[in-house]
């Protein structure tokens, strides 16, 4: 079967487990919004993982609370697979196909520990500021880090994602970090670290408990850790990151609880669902038409301030 998943560490771990279980033999990495909007062809030969449900798929695995709200899963949708709230979609697949009996080596090597921590944002300030091992790999392989915006690598990020499926099944974490295609991305990540922090500070405004990071006027959005703002702004408990979408036709809002100040109570996934997006209680994203961006931003900001 063919896997359709997103290009992040959780998507990678899903691919590793599904290939280990003999379920898939090909892959397609996509943006979840494209799946939700019907822009990705889906057939009964496809396994959807960590992306919105599409009728007619062969298998579906997910862990986003907004999908259960969107589809009212218990009564209205029939599918093969599993969808339930979880720290990662990989953990849903892990449990579905036998847990430790089948996948013990991925507990032993630390991959499952890392994907649960990174995808749920269960990270310490030290892990954000000084990432090592699997946690570092989780940042390097996440499209939101921004390393894929550069085109001067030996191979593309999509090719590296494909190669990493084999690496994670056959190599130790230390060996993976020594792969030249991984090393050059690690080097870029650390070389831009201080400039990335400066960029975040220069484009952040604080509104009570909410930080708004508006990067629409930034010519080159540097690569960096998407959690760093929570270390830089410990008094705020939720962030809204604002960037241009494709061809500046829409604006993307990425909203998330602070992982260092865990006092926000708003349901982010449900809020994003109102704007055609989705997510979990603590994190989510949506895209809105450019002409409605300011109106939408103010409405989202009002909800987050009220739920702070």
Task: Give residue spans per PLM region.
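Hydrophobic, aromatic-enriched interface-forming segments
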Residues: 118-209
